[in-house]
Amino acid sequence: MRRFVYCKVVLATSLMWVLVDVFLLLYFSECNKCDDKKERSLLPALRAVISRNQEGPGEMGKAVLIPKDDQEKMKELFKINQFNLMASDLIALNRSLPDVRLEGCKTKVYPDELPNTSVVIVFHNEAWSTLLRTVYSVINRSPHYLLSEVILVDDASERDFLKLTLENYVKTLEVPVKIIRMEERSGLIRARLRGAAASKGQVITFLDAHCECTLGWLEPLLARIKEDRKTVVCPIIDVISDDTFEYMAGSDMTYGGFNWKLNFRWYPVPQREMDRRKGDRTLPVRTPTMAGGLFSIDRNYFEEIGTYDAGMDIWGGENLEMSFRIWQCGGSLEIVTCSHVGHVFRKATPYTFPGGTGHVINKNNRRLAEVWMDEFKDFFYIISPGVVKVDYGDVSVRKTLRENLKCKPFSWYLENIYPDSQIPRRYYSLGEIRNVETNQCLDNMGRKENEKVGIFNCHGMGGNQVFSYTADKEIRTDDLCLDVSRLSGPVIMLKCHHMRGNQLWEYDAERLTLRHANSNQCLDEPSEEDKMVPTMQDCSGSRSQQWLLRNMTLGT
């Protein structure tokens, strides 16, 4: 009896696969006669699902753990690309991934006539497995009628397998894949410009070379551009672990911002944006800035808005420059929450830059500050004083672009697009806060959130001793505010919450006192127990409770 049941199961399974084979054979043979683009678009995804063994390493985005015996070899290979190359090479180039979209996204219907796109991917000495996994994920999870081409821009790679071997391999793929070779190491910005110039699609989609696109990633991006060609759209960027290549869904409740040092940062989506969307998390999020690695833009609009600043070097700052330019010049920037693309986030870069990473990024950031930030560039210069010594080249062409596009001032951007910015729109002072008694200055000591603010000899060089007393009566250093939560308690640096309370300080310009409103105590000099941190004491009017708020300027 058991044998009979077993035979029936085997026969049923075999019959099912025969029917699948027949279906695919008929489907392929009739594909050229098919007019329904949506039906054709099912082919790559269907083929990928049927062909995948979901029990293999890394399938469904699961972590790959390397045995102890191979740990030393794994560590050596890790140094090549600054991610676990051994784990990556064990994973199939077209591995399966979970559907991490919100439930409401899975049932959305998009217009039939969407613009097509060229996908531009820049690489330099990229690992074979991560580069090809990026390409396969684009091809397998994109409707082919929307995929004009994939353009791989080789930024002067030195590895042999990225030469003829790669050229021969991509010829076998079912979507046109073009390889463009840069004559010399040019960096991400100029390589992307080269790829964009060669593109034919109505939309350009930029991806990094170590990404994985998920099911339904492309249609929501293109649909939003179809609605408004001046909208630049980004997917939610999911995290691919650099250690295990585990695929982890990113949050739809964060958006892009930046701090005084012009470092891109993720911050919680504010309530005002949730209210604008009426609580519908499947609607796009308006974001002040983008991370810059992954986005789609109408090709003609990319030209109209000024592409990239070609005077910038290699990488860094181009994402904020483009973000400011889009918003200030009449466009909009959004995170489309129904689109998910994974990205390998590395703890360190494997690349070297001429002059060093810091020099390159400082030059790029100074260019964007000079062109787009108006008087608010002082926040950047004062907290990063070394930047003013960097030669940033000629920005006259970019300033002319701003004039021709009739772009709005940076104050408008802060007021209307990023009102919760870490840069206050109105403030009383920007510079040092000096104690009259000790002649020492408040100093953040390079400390992080939840740590005590310090006090140190004044050096007049900005940096860690730059604080802003804002019109909202906060004392800010970068994106942290001075906070006191209990009587005589320590002065802690916490994320600015803009709700006053423990972060509200009253400065008396006559008595020179800084009174904490909630505790009704005054900021005082350090105690004998710890001479490196200020204290909170009952207000007495003593010299030790007197502070000079000085505006600082640096020659630029």
UniProtKB/Swiss-Prot annotation:
Tissue: Specifically expressed in neuronal cells. Not expressed in glial cells such as astrocytes. Expressed at low level.
Catalytic activity field: L-seryl-[protein] + UDP-N-acetyl-alpha-D-galactosamine = a 3-O-[N-acetyl-alpha-D-galactosaminyl]-L-seryl-[protein] + UDP + H(+); L-threonyl-[protein] + UDP-N-acetyl-alpha-D-galactosamine = a 3-O-[N-acetyl-alpha-D-galactosaminyl]-L-threonyl-[protein] + UDP + H(+)
Subcellular location: Golgi apparatus membrane
Purpose of the protein: Catalyzes the initial reaction in O-linked oligosaccharide biosynthesis, the transfer of an N-acetyl-D-galactosamine (GalNAc) residue from UDP-GalNAc to a serine or threonine residue on the protein receptor. Generates GalNAc-O-Ser/Thr structure also known as Tn antigen, which itself is immunogenic but also serves as a precursor for the synthesis of different mucin-type O-glycan core structures. Contributes to the synthesis of O-linked glycans on mucins and proteoglycans of the central nervous system.
Its membrane topology: Single-pass type II membrane protein
Reported cofactor(s): Mn(2+)
Superkingdom of this protein's organism: Eukaryota
Broad enzyme group: transferase
Consequences of knocking out this gene: No visible phenotype. It however abolishes Tn antigen in neuronal cells.
UniProt-annotated stretches for the region Catalytic subdomain B: 284-346
Pfam families according to UniProt: Glycos_transf_2, Ricin_B_lectin
Origin organism lineage: Eukaryota, Metazoa, Chordata, Craniata, Vertebrata
Membrane side Lumenal: residue ranges: 28-556
Keyword Methyltransferase applies: no
Transmembrane annotation, as ranges: 5-27
Ranges facing Cytoplasmic side: 1-4
GO CC entries: Golgi membrane
Pathway the protein contributes to: Protein modification; protein glycosylation
CDD domains registered for this protein in UniProt: beta-trefoil_Ricin_GALNT13, pp-GalNAc-T
Disulfide bond annotation, renumbered to this chain: C105-C338, C329-C407, C441-C458, C481-C496, C522-C539
Organism: Mus musculus (Mouse)
Gene Ontology biological-process annotations: protein O-linked glycosylation; protein O-linked glycosylation via serine; protein O-linked glycosylation via threonine
Protein name, per record: Polypeptide N-acetylgalactosaminyltransferase 13
SMART domains per the UniProt record, alphabetical: RICIN
Region called Catalytic subdomain A, residue ranges: 114-224
Free-text comment about domains: There are two conserved domains in the glycosyltransferase region: the N-terminal domain (domain A, also called GT1 motif), which is probably involved in manganese coordination and substrate binding and the C-terminal domain (domain B, also called Gal/GalNAc-T motif), which is probably involved in catalytic reaction and UDP-Gal binding.
Annotated positions binding substrate: D155, R185, W315, R346, Y351
UniProt keywords, alphabetically: Disulfide bond, Glycoprotein, Glycosyltransferase, Golgi apparatus, Lectin, Manganese, Membrane, Metal-binding, Signal-anchor, Transferase, Transmembrane, Transmembrane helix
